[in-house]
């Protein structure tokens, strides 16, 4: 019976699958532990009659500018029961491996894994990896948890690319606390002097309404309700997420597509009581908040007051 695949240095750490490189990577130290996912497809091709000016022949993966060597280097890992010479070779190579590259490789795998879980596109992953590279070079987060750093970089990349995710969403696909991610986020923004656009409730409307299977008419009404509430200074001190959730609750309750405060809170990552408390701030001005052309199924005076 074969021994389980695990990092010889951190045997209790859950390994990350790097599908593109075909590797199993230890997120704690960046060690490539196994290669069970290698793509068996053709690695290169060449046709003499192709008209393209570029030579299509290529062996190996393209260079990665985020690594000092330009590409991922192979690290020898030895399972339990390996010979003394194997262990000596692995230890020598691990010691000689660039520490920055080791951290970078592990971080890119973490970022890719988290991104895939919440269906973020490749450009967001690349942006987060570049931010992580800048953080490494700045040494601002030296000694901080590698996964917390990667999660914070992913959060910032989402903000910068106009597809913001909440701290709770990022926390849910990582193995670190929201508090740790938040600390790293603050340090990164300060040290890199990163300018981030202010988040508004409108940034979340499309995704929240889509996840609730609400029609465009409800999304449009909720967007207007939230914007007017902010303009009228009804929701001072409330987060864009809770404002969006409360506006969706109000718009849906006035329509045939009703959704409960709990349903909306679950999608938005807000507590039901938070949705209701924010809604109570909107309710007295409901007549002014709704679009003029909104088709009420439930009139304003019949809406829940909390």
Swiss-Prot record:
Keywords: Metal-binding, Nucleus, Repeat, Transcription, Transcription regulation, Zinc, Zinc-finger. InterPro entries: Cyclin-like_dom, Cyclin-like_sf, TFIIB, TFIIB_CS, TFIIB_cyclin, Znf_TFIIB. Residues 47-66 are annotated as: Disordered. Pfam families: TFIIB, Zn_Ribbon_TF. The gene is ttb-1. The keyword Ribosomal protein does not apply. GO terms for molecular function: RNA polymerase II general transcription initiation factor activity; TBP-class protein binding; zinc ion binding. Belongs to the TFIIB family. Sequence repeats lie at residues 114-190, 208-284. CDD domains: CYCLIN_TFIIB_rpt1, CYCLIN_TFIIB_rpt2. Associates with TFIID-TFIIA (DA complex) to form TFIID-IIA-IIB (DAB-complex) which is then recognized by RNA polymerase II. This is Transcription initiation factor IIB. General transcription factor that plays a role in transcription initiation by RNA polymerase II (Pol II). Involved in the pre-initiation complex (PIC) formation and Pol II recruitment at promoter DNA. Essential for early embryonic development.
């Amino acid at each position: 019976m074969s021994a389980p695949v695990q990092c010889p240095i951190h045997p209790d750490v859950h390994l990350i699958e790097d599908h593109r490189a075909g590797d199993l990577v230890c997120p704690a130290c960046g060690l490539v532990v196994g290669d069970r996912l290698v793509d068996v497809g053709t690695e290169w091709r060449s046709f003499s009659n192709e008209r393209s000016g570029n030579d299509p022949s290529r062996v190996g993966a393209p260079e990665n500018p985020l690594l000092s060597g330009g590409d991922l280097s192979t690290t020898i890992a030895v399972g339990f029961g390996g010979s003394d010479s194997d262990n000596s070779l692995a230890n020598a190579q691990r010691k000689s491996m660039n520490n920055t590259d080791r951290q970078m490789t592990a971080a890119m795998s973490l970022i890719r894994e988290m991104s895939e879980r919440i269906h973020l596109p490749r450009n967001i992953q690349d942006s987060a990896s570049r931010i992580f590279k800048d953080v490494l070079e700045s040494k601002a987060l030296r000694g901080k948890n590698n996964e917390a750093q990667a999660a914070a970089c992913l959060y910032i990349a989402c903000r910068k690319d106009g597809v913001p995710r909440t701290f709770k969403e990022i926390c849910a696909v990582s193995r670190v606390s929201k508090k740790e991610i938040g600390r790293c986020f603050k340090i990164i923004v300060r040290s890199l002097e990163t300018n981030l656009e202010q988040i508004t409730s409108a940034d979340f409307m499309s995704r929240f309404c889509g996840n609730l299977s609400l029609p465009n008419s409800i999304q449009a009404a909720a967007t207007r309700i939230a914007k007017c509430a902010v303009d009228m200074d009804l929701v001072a001190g409330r987060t864009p997420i809770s404002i969006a959730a409360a506006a969706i609750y109000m718009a849906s309750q006035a329509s045939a597509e009703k959704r409960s405060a709990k349903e909306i809170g679950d999608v938005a990552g807000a507590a039901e009581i938070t949705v209701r408390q924010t809604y109570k701030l909107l309710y007295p001005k409901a007549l002014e908040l709704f679009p003029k052309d909104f088709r009420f199924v439930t009139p304003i005076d019949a809406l829940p007051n909390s």
